């Protein structure tokens, strides 16, 4: 049976009966050990710059790395940030056609989390986000789940349940969480379980029922993972470690020939003199190869992977004047086109996440929200000259694309509502004063203003 792009964490069950579900949960707990995805864990390590030594050290003899530590770079998170520009600017979320401040105040760190989530989804090929309500702090919080198992009823394409591993006090005993949705009259379930399939209630939920009726997990899936970026990060780290070793050995390795056994250990130093027997030699031997060639070979690895992912690299030593905003836009055209494709994927994710948030807030009696939801992803901007920026803003203002209020927020996004109202009030008064001074006045008005009437 061929597996065309399907996750190894996809679990099929024959029906929705509790017995079938629990049997699948037991199998899933055991399969977590057998199907642990090394590539995914490696990608996570490179993205978060953690545990990198263990990935590099295995490619070197133990004696080699006693000379220099492994080289650790940050190319993987930089690739991910450069490629995923969908949340580069904060998304504008509209409920019933307008910004809902009550909802926005409840969504804790949503912009930061969605930005990180999008980068991981692109890198791993698939990622999950769990929405949860923190009753102690009265807010919605979000947790990124890189590795989740999906449960499908045979013949269906939409999962009805998810499970994922959580931290446990005893690291030798794994613990998991299970969520299933209410479907076909069967109540959803929610509980923790261990590798043997023993279930445990979550907090006071002794009946192990899903209080929301839906699974509070949203998902983004790409057609492929970007593991080539992780592998390039590993190759670059290995190559740079080799270069560091080469630099260390450039001073040369002292070599003696013609010495008798027992005379091989000598003290080095400029204040030590060596008396060599007849026929013996002493010199320093340095490794061959050009460091410039090694560096260029390493850069070519990064360039190749960047091109394959619609990216480009501008190296620090690149000369010439800085490119203009339009030139940058042309150079980034492939990445901008890829971003347009990403919008459809993340628009669906945003709607799924909002429906989950809406349901959670209703169950906790916090807020009732409209079903009408829209998201406006911020446009990618490129640097402009002051003249170009003024002309652009002036054109938008003249054509009613932006208002004076938008213009003030453009220059000071952190301006409070009170500040904004004061500024707008001052601008209106100034405009009114200018308008009055330019209006023709009657003879009576000029008399009141202290001017003598003119004869017609």
Predicted regions mapped to residue ranges:
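Extended, helix-rich architectural segments
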Residues: 1-140, 452-456
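Extended, non-catalytic structural segments that build the interaction scaffolds
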Residues: 42, 51-62, 274-308, 325-348, ...
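Extended, regular secondary-structure scaffolds
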Residues: 119-123, 128-219
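Amphipathic alpha-helical protein-protein interaction segments
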Residues: 125-130, 308, 406-410
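Extended, charged amphipathic alpha-helical segments
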Residues: 200-334, 364-367, 384
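Substrate-recognition/cap regions that form aromatic- and gly/pro-loop-enriched pockets
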Residues: 355-366
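Short, basic interhelical loop/turn and adjoining N-cap
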Residues: 412-421
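Extended, compositionally biased alpha-helical segments that mediate assembly or anchoring
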Residues: 422-456
């Amino acid at each position: 049976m061929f597996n065309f792009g399907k996750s190894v964490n996809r679990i099929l069950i024959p029906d929705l009966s509790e017995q079938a579900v629990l049997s699948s949960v037991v199998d899933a707990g055991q399969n977590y050990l057998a199907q642990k995805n090394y590539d995914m864990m490696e990608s996570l390590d490179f993205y978060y710059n953690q545990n990198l030594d263990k990935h590099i050290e295995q490619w070197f003899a133990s004696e080699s790395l006693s000379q220099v530590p492994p080289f650790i770079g940050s190319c993987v998170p930089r690739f991910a940030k450069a490629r995923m520009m969908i949340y580069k600017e904060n998304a504008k979320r509209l409920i019933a056609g307008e910004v809902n401040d009550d909802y926005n105040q409840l969504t804790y760190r949503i912009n930061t989390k969605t930005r990180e989530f999008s980068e991981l989804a692109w890198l791993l090929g698939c990622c999950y986000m769990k929405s949860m309500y923190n009753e102690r702090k009265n807010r919605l919080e979000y947790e990124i789940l890189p590795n989740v198992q999906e449960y499908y009823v045979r013949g269906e394409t939409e999962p009805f349940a998810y499970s994922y591993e959580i931290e446990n006090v005893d690291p030798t005993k794994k613990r998991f969480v299970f969520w299933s949705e209410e479907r076909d009259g069967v109540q959803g379930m929610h509980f923790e379980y261990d590798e043997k399939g023993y279930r445990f209630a979550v907090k006071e939920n002794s009946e192990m029922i899903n209080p929301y009726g839906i699974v509070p997990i949203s998902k983004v899936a790409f057609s492929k993972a970007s593991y080539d970026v992780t592998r390039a990060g590993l190759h670059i780290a290995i190559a740079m470690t080799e270069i560091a070793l080469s630099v260390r050995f450039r001073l040369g390795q002292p070599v003696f020939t013609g010495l008798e056994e027992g005379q091989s250990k000598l003290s080095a130093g400029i204040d030590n003199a060596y008396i060599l027997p007849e026929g013996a030699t002493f010199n320093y031997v340095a490794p061959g190869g050009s460091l410039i060639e090694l560096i260029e070979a390493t850069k070519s690895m990064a360039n190749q992977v960047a091109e394959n992912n619609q990216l480009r690299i501008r190296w620090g030593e690149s000369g010439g004047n800085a490119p203009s905003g339009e030139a940058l836009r042309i150079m980034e055209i492939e990445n901008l086109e890829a971003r347009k494709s990403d919008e459809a994927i993340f628009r669906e994710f945003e709607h799924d996440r909002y429906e989950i948030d809406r349901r959670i807030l209703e169950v906790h009696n916090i807020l009732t929200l409209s079903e009408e939801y829209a998201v406006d992803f911020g446009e990618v901007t490129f640097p402009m000259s002051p003249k170009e920026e003024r002309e652009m803003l002036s054109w938008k203002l003249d054509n009613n694309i932006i208002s004076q209020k938008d213009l003030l927020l453009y220059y000071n996004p952190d301006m409070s509502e009170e500040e904004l109202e004061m500024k707008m009030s001052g601008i209106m008064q100034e405009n009114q004063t200018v308008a009055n001074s330019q209006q023709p006045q009657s003879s009576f008005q000029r008399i009141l203003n202290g001017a003598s009437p003119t004869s017609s």
